[in-house]
């Protein structure tokens, strides 16, 4: 039977000093010997997805104490990608993921905590905590802050749904009046919660369900709805049960590496493809697999992208549906139910409830269950009232959306497309692969050929688009924005947004070794690996070179002979220390970012640290 980790600091006469300090935090004699459970919160007033989390830690802590554990809360940082977007702040977003993972490891190992409840929500916080969970491999449950309600406003006598991306597009569209732009801005983000479409935050919180690390409804129940409180309370109670199963019953199925195993990663990727999740999820799942020491690659993802259909289409891929609509249609579990009936899932994997995925589908899929409480749970809907308070309303839809022919979630026979919403491409310009969100690509753009228009920074690309230098038919190439080259692998939401604002959304393709926001749609291909700064072919592309993109065949080709590429490579190498660096970019880089860049791998490895290099440095 495993010994409680916390016994290191709570047992024995030689730990009198540590116990004295524990007593100063409120612990008493009866607490020593109970499991100490870390409540890992991420409250901040900078981020709407986290602004309502201040009291959530103590809500969970109360449930832990009531169930027989000792709860100790601490906080991580949280970066808002939307606010950091379009300026140097975005350089810090992806590195913050790894900083969060490290900070959780530091706190949990320094204080010998026995288990964790991770209260996350937005883009880099959920994956950062997930990486830490896999690294530490102690019992854990994820519970997120929940999605924002979709915005609504009246334009041209019509009520339309809105989200953050609409505000960005219309704000840069010269044909939109100041009055309408202001209306959209004021209505796009009406409540606390993660932005209302299938962007990165909501994608990751949905994947936490599919991995078995979060409770049913975690990815889709609105932040404002009263029913979400039960997820926090249940997480606090259930983590004590998980902890007992491991430490008292020696049940290793309670550990995250045995829950989020390779088969669970398969299920999560199937969900991701079926719901057209953010391309960032590929980066984060690869990083999670690395931390769990699971051999899971972009090749595995590519195989699934060819056989998994798209069963759910949500903003930004369509204006019709947002996360509140996904929840009404049965949420993540109902999508998994359709995938299971299509024979695509591994349903015998365990979860934090102590059951299997098959059990969860049988109980929570709204097309299968007769449980009226579960049906009521999925009828939880928006109130349409501006607020930053959690659990502030209890509105419900009159009916569920169980229409699997024309609804938000479809069955296999009525899929939005037979191939899913994400695809991995490869070719001489991306030898180790690149990623596109096919859910947001129109059918007439699945094959595209055009001349390269080169930019060596996102800033230059934005200026080029807005100044009219980019024309229809071009492939906009933004390079040296990868994990190492940025550094930090910026999101390219502004270039894609401004292409749409200038009427070029379907007339141009965009290719980058950077990444894209979950709010991106259109022919936007990111994560080109190897990146330019790591000797990738994308660094050798010259102005006017023809690039051919073929999503159905999963190919992307720079139409330049191998002989010419070798000549260009030799010329690049001859530059010595200036090789594989942008020619004219002026960008101050802090020591914190230099530290990240020194060890960063390309996107096909999840942009995690280069472990081989790190081991070599330490061994020296």
From Swiss-Prot:
Catalytic reaction equation(s): (2R)-2,3-dihydroxy-3-methylbutanoate = 3-methyl-2-oxobutanoate + H2O; (2R,3R)-2,3-dihydroxy-3-methylpentanoate = (S)-3-methyl-2-oxopentanoate + H2O
GO cellular component: cytosol
Pfam families linked to this entry: ILV_EDD_C, ILVD_EDD_N
Membrane-crossing segments per the record: none
Active site: 517
InterPro entries: Dihydro-acid_dehy_C, DihydroxyA_deHydtase, DiOHA_6PGluconate_deHydtase_CS, ILV_EDD_C, ILV_EDD_N, IlvD/EDD_N
Superkingdom: Bacteria
Function: Functions in the biosynthesis of branched-chain amino acids. Catalyzes the dehydration of (2R,3R)-2,3-dihydroxy-3-methylpentanoate (2,3-dihydroxy-3-methylvalerate) into 2-oxo-3-methylpentanoate (2-oxo-3-methylvalerate) and of (2R)-2,3-dihydroxy-3-methylbutanoate (2,3-dihydroxyisovalerate) into 2-oxo-3-methylbutanoate (2-oxoisovalerate), the penultimate precursor to L-isoleucine and L-valine, respectively.
Family per similarity comment: Belongs to the IlvD/Edd family.
Descriptive protein name: Dihydroxy-acid dehydratase
Species assigned in the record: Colwellia psychrerythraea (strain 34H / ATCC BAA-681) (Vibrio psychroerythus)
Lineage: Bacteria, Pseudomonadati, Pseudomonadota, Gammaproteobacteria, Alteromonadales
Gene symbol of the encoding locus: ilvD
């Amino acid at each position: 039977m495993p010994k409680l980790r916390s016994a290191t600091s709570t047992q024995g006469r030689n730990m009198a000093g540590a116990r004295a300090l524990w007593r100063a935090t409120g612990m008493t004699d009866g607490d020593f010997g109970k499991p100490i459970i870390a409540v890992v919160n991420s409250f901040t007033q900078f981020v709407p997805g986290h602004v309502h989390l201040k009291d959530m830690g103590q809500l969970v802590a109360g449930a832990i104490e009531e169930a027989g554990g000792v709860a100790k809360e601490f906080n991580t940082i949280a970066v808002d990608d939307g606010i950091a977007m379009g300026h140097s702040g975005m350089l810090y977003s992806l590195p913050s993921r790894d900083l969060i993972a490290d900070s959780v490891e530091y706190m949990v190992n320094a204080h010998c905590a026995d288990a964790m409840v991770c209260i996350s929500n937005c883009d880099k916080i959920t994956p950062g905590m997930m990486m830490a969970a896999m690294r530490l491999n102690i019992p854990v449950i994820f519970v997120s802050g929940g999605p924002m309600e979709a915005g609504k406003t009246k334009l041209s006598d019509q009520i339309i749904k809105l989200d953050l991306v609409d505000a960005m597009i219309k704000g840069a569209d010269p044909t939109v009046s100041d009055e309408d732009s202001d209306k959209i801005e004021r209505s796009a983000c009406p409540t606390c919660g993660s932005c209302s479409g299938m962007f990165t935050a909501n994608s990751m919180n949905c994947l936490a369900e599919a991995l078995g690390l979060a409770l049913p409804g975690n990815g889709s129940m609105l932040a404002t709805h009263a029913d979400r409180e039960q997820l926090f309370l249940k997480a606090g109670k259930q983590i004590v049960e998980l902890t007992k199963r491991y430490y008292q019953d020696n049940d290793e199925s309670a550990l995250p590496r045995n829950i989020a195993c390779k088969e669970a990663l398969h299920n999560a990727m199937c969900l991701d493809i079926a719901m057209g999740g953010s391309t960032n999820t590929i980066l984060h799942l690869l990083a999670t697999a690395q931390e769990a020491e699971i051999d899971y690659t972009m090749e595995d993802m590519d195989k699934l992208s060819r056989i998994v259909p798209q069963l759910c289409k949500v903003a930004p891929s369509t204006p019709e549906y947002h996360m509140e609509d996904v929840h009404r249609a049965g949420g993540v579990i109902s999508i998994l139910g359709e995938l299971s009936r299509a024979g695509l899932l591994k349903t015998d994997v365990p979860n934090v409830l102590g059951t299997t995925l098959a059990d969860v589908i049988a109980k929570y899929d709204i097309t299968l269950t007769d449980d009226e409480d579960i049906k009521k749970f999925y009828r939880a809907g928006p109130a349409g009232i501006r607020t930053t308070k959690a659990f502030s309303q209890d509105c419900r839809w009159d009916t569920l959306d169980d229409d699997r022919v024309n609804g938000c979630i479809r069955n296999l026979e009525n899929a939005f497309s037979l191939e899913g919403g994400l695809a991995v491409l490869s070719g001489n310009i991306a030898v180790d692969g690149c990623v596109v969100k096919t859910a947001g690509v129109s059918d007439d753009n699945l094959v595209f050929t055009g001349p390269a228009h080169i930019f060596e920074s996102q800033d230059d690309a934005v200026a080029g688009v807005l100044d009219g230098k980019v024309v229809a038919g071009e492939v906009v190439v933004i390079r040296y924005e990868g994990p190492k080259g940025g550094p930090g692998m910026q999101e390219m939401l502004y270039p894609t947004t401004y292409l749409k604002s200038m009427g070029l959304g379907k007339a141009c393709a965009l290719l980058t070794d950077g990444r894209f926001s979950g709010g991106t749609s259109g022919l936007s291909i990111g994560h080109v690996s190897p990146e330019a700064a790591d000797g990738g072919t994308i660094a050798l592309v010259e102005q006017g070179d023809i690039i051919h993109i073929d999503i159905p065949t999963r190919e992307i080709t720079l139409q330049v002979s191998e002989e010419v590429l070798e000549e260009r490579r030799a010329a690049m190498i001859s530059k010595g220390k200036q090789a594989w660096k942008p020619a004219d970019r002026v960008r101050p880089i802090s020591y914190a970012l230099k530290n990240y860049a020194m060890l960063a791998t390309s996107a096909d490895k999840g942009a995690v640290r280069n472990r081989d290099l790190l081991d070599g440095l330490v061994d020296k």
